[in-house]
Amino acid sequence: MSTVQVPKLNTKDLLTLEELTKEEIISLIEFAIHLKKNKQEPLLQGKILGLIFDKHSTRTRVSFEAGMVQLGGHGMFLSGKEMQMGRGETVSDTAKVLSQYIDGIMIRTFSHADVEELAKESSIPVINGLTDDHHPCQALADLMTIYEETNTFKGIKLAYVGDGNNVCHSLLLASAKVGMHMTVATPVGYEPNEEIVKKALAIAKETGAEIEVLHDPELAVNEADFIYTDVWMSMGQEGEEEKYTLFQPYQINKELVTHAKQTYRFLHCLPAHREEEVTGEIIDGPQSIVFEQAGNRLHAQKALLVSLFKSVEELS
């Protein structure tokens, strides 16, 4: 049994990283590192987590299911298309019914508004496993990976190059929360959501973080400690081939990384499209830590699950 204190969270759900304080994020990361060293701890014995998927998944499904098993609980896969919700049952009714059967819900879907409604109407914790707007579990794992490499966030520069998508949104909020310097470089028209950038800038004023949204990839990666990218076409965007030409200057390759620190590390949330957003030379090279990063999804989510479940128990 763990001797490390389980972090107390002042939230029932995790829909975006706005809901966590800097202190809570750091505590979750430290707890995740502990769980990484002590995989089999039955901290959620007998608990059931419902896993609702409307989008394809490898890392999210396997890491949540494996995490629940390692914690002594059970992950129950629920296909959104096969549930009554896929045939017109309301999100509200679904939330209330599932609250009678299971102990928590993880949902990976398109509409962030649906996840917000699910959380509002359920009496059990709801975790956002990905929406079109946010990917908080990925960002937690990313912060954990950076922290393992540097043991600090102060003075660390993270450069995100590519599409200003859901991953970028969560990284902006994450970087702002922990006081990190984050630069984003996207083509014109593919910047991150303006409202989310405003939120990140407001948080940064309180934490001392530095947030920049640019269009020059060389300027963005200048002296960066970490370079991060994602696919140019997210699920549901296939067929927008004109993006390839527009995004080509934003490819992470050996020329671009010369502007970063020599000791930079490469991050990618995966799946990757080699020779599109990143060359094989970079993602398979010695400075890439993408598979360690993917592995940390398991540990960060385990820490989150235990903390949310325990915090809700104490509040009830």
From Swiss-Prot:
Family annotation (InterPro entries): Asp/Orn_carbamoyltranf_P-bd, Asp/Orn_carbamoylTrfase, Asp/Orn_carbamoylTrfase_sf, Asp_carbamoyltransf_Asp/Orn-bd, Orn/put_carbamltrans, OTCase_ArgI
Catalytic activity: carbamoyl phosphate + L-ornithine = L-citrulline + phosphate + H(+)
Subcellular location per the Swiss-Prot or TrEMBL entry: Cytoplasm
Chain positions recorded as L-ornithine binding sites: N166, D230, S234, M235
Keyword Zinc: no
Record flagged with keyword Transmembrane helix: no
GO molecular function, one term: amino acid binding
Binding-site residues for carbamoyl phosphate, renumbered to this chain: S57, T58, R59, T60, Q84, R108, H135, P136, C137, Q138, C269, L270, R297
SUPFAM superfamilies, alphabetized: Aspartate/ornithine carbamoyltransferase
Cysteines paired by S-S bonds: none
Record family assignment: Belongs to the aspartate/ornithine carbamoyltransferase superfamily. OTCase family.
Protein name: Ornithine carbamoyltransferase
